[in-house]
C-alpha cells in the first residue's frame, strides 16, 4: 500500500478548483495527512518587455509579482481556513513560472508530496472533460494525480476500477488503489480488455475445459500474485473466493488485518479506451490507472490512447506513474 502523508492542491481560485478542496481534506482526515495549497502566477514576458521599452515606473519583479504573490497567499489561506481542518492544514505556496503544470509537478516532487488532488478543469473550461493544465500535470508528474469533479462525493467512494493488461507496469496502480480502498472501505474491480486480436494473457497456460474468460482470469490472478511477490508487498495476500471472478485482498497491519473485495471484469470490446470509458461510467466511482501499460492494452497512459482515456472519462481519475527505471527496463 502507498502511504499518504502530504497532499498538494493546485488552485486557480475558480469555482471548479474548489471541488478539490473537500476531497483533499477528506483524504487527509482519513489518512492522517497534511494539505498544502499551491498557486502559480504565469510569467508575463511580453508585458515585462513592454514595460521596459516604455520606461514605465512599475517593475514586475520588484512590485507587481510580490504584490500578486502576497494576494494569492492570502486567498489560499482564506480557502484553507474555510475548507481544511486545523489538524490537516499545511502551507500555502505561490510561485512565478512560465509553465504552471511543470511548476506544480516539480514542486510536488521536490517537496515529497504523496498525492496531488486537483479539479478536472479550472478557469479555462474546455469541451474536453479534463482541462489542458490538468492533463499536462498528469503527463509530467511523478507524483500520483487525483483529478476530481462535482460528480464524486467527497465523503466516500465505494467502487474503484483498476484497468490492467496483466503487465507489472499496469499493476503499478495497485498500491494506491489499495490505499484508497482501505481508507474508504471500497471494493476494487480489475478491468481487462479482450480486443479483437485477443488478450496479452492468451499466451499463459490454458485449460481447455475452461472458457476464455476463466483462463484469462486465472492468468491475471497468477500475475497479480507474482507482482506482489516481486515488489515485496508481503502484507497483502489474495484470498481466492468460492465464486468465480470474486476474491479478496487480505491486508495485514501488525496484529490486525482488513479485507478488500476484488472483482475481475473481462470484456471483449473494439478498443481498450472505449471499454474503459463505458465500464467506468456504469460501475466506478474512480478509476486508478498506471500511466503506462504494455502490449495490446495500448500506450496507456503515455500516448494517444492515454490522452483519449484521460480526457474523455466522465469518471474521476487517479493516475500513477511507474518508476523511471522500470519504464526504461520495459
Task: Locate predicted features.
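Small/aliphatic-rich secondary-structure junction motif
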Residues: 1-59, 87, 159-217, 225, ...
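Short, ordered loop/turn segments at secondary-structure junctions
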Residues: 40, 121, 150-152, 193, ...
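Glycine-rich, Arg-bearing micro-motifs that act as flexible, cationic patches
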Residues: 118-136, 268-274, 289-312, 326-327
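Short, structured interface segments
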Residues: 132-152
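Short beta-strand elements of ligand-binding domains
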Residues: 117-120, 144-150, 317-321
Amino acid at each position: 500500500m502507498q502511504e499518504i502523508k502530504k497532499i498538494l492542491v493546485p488552485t486557480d481560485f475558480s469555482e471548479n478548483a474548489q471541488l478539490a478542496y473537500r476531497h483533499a481534506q477528506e483524504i487527509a482526515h482519513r489518512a492522517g495527512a497534511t494539505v498544502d495549497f499551491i498557486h502559480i502566477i504565469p510569467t508575463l514576458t511580453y508585458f515585462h518587455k513592454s514595460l521596459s521599452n516604455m520606461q514605465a515606473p512599475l517593475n514586475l519583479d520588484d512590485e507587481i509579482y510580490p504584490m500578486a504573490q502576497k494576494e494569492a497567499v492570502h486567498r489560499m489561506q482564506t480557502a484553507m481556513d474555510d475548507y481544511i481542518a486545523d489538524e490537516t492544514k499545511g502551507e500555502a505556496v505561490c510561485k512565478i513560472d512560465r509553465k504552471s503544470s511543470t511548476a506544480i509537478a516539480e514542486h510536488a516532487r521536490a517537496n515529497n508530496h504523496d498525492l496531488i488532488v486537483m479539479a478536472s478543469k479550472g478557469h479555462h473550461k474546455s469541451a474536453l472533460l479534463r482541462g489542458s493544465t490538468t492533463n499536462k500535470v498528469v503527463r509530467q508528474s511523478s507524483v500520483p494525480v487525483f483529478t476530481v469533479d462535482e460528480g464524486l462525493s467527497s465523503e466516500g467512494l465505494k467502487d474503484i476500477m483498476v484497468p490492467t493488461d496483466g503487465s507489472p507496469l499496469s499493476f503499478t496502480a495497485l498500491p494506491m488503489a489499495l490505499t484508497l480502498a482501505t481508507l474508504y472501505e471500497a471494493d476494487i474491480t480489475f478491468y481487462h480488455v479482450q480486443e479483437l486480436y485477443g488478450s496479452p494473457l492468451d499466451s499463459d497456460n490454458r485449460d481447455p475445459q475452461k472458457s476464455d474468460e476463466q483462463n484469462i482470469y486465472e492468468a491475471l490472478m497468477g500475475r497479480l500474485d507474482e507482482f506482489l511477490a516481486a515488489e515485496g508487498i508481503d502484507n497483502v495476500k489474495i484470498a481466492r473466493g468460492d465464486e468465480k471472478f470474486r476474491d479478496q485482498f487480505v491486508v495485514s497491519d501488525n496484529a490486525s488485518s482488513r479485507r478488500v473485495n476484488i472483482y475481475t471484469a473481462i470484456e471483449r470490446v473494439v478498443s481498450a479506451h472505449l471499454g474503459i470509458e463505458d465500464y467506468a461510467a456504469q460501475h466506478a466511482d474512480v478509476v486508478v490507472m498506471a500511466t503506462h501499460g504494455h502490449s495490446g492494452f495500448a500506450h496507456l497512459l503515455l500516448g494517444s490512447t492515454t490522452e483519449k482515456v484521460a480526457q474523455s472519462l466522465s469518471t474521476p481519475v487517479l493516475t500513477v506513474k511507474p518508476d523511471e527505471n522500470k519504464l526504461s527496463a520495459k
